Amino acid sequence: MKRSKVERQSMLKEKIELTPFVTDEQLAKEFHVSIQTIRLDRMELAIPELRERIKHVATNQWNETVKALPLEEVIGEVIDLELDERAISIMDITPDLVFSRNKIARGHHIFAQANSLAVAVINDELALTAKSNLKFTRQVNEGERVIAKAIVKGKDNRDRTIVEVSSYVENELVFTGEFFMFHSSNEKGEN
């Protein structure tokens, strides 16, 4: 049964409020309409596009929290952060991030998302990657969304913070990395 425009827009607004990181494509499938219809509905309702919604949430929630680097230097969009505990970021694989011939994401972008998230999760003004162990488990293609999840695991025998980052595309592991983070409190004998 086809919904009226008013009913669809009301449901659309509610859906975006509940899940602000939902894409227009996902909304179009859910509401059985074209992507253009979703975009027109969003415009009429003054709901910004996904990237702007993400930036709004990230800026409002994390700008004062991230210490080790400016939020705009984190690769991907931070959507969850608890310093010295965990962090999550998302990155859409756009044409500028892939090889032109095969549309596969360049590995350094996947690494950069994970590494910058490992830096961002550290509760210190200075955090640097001292060492990392990485594994790419499958290629990532243009149009896919990478969700990176960082978890602080503890300290190594040199007092460096160990951050484990796992990156997923639709719940499939595509990258994993163990980052050994040096930070300025290491020098001061703190933490």
Curated annotation (Swiss-Prot):
One of its GO terms (biological process) is fatty acid biosynthetic process. CDD domains: hot_dog. Keywords: DNA-binding, Fatty acid biosynthesis, Fatty acid metabolism, Lipid biosynthesis, Lipid metabolism, Repressor, Transcription, Transcription regulation. The keyword DNA-binding applies. One of its GO terms (molecular function) is DNA-binding transcription factor activity. Transcriptional factor involved in regulation of membrane lipid biosynthesis by repressing genes involved in fatty acid and phospholipid metabolism. NCBIfam families: PRK04424.1 (NF003359). Belongs to the FapR family. This is Transcription factor FapR. It comes from Oceanobacillus iheyensis (strain DSM 14371 / CIP 107618 / JCM 11309 / KCTC 3954 / HTE831). The lineage of its organism: Bacteria, Bacillati, Bacillota, Bacilli, Bacillales. The gene is fapR.
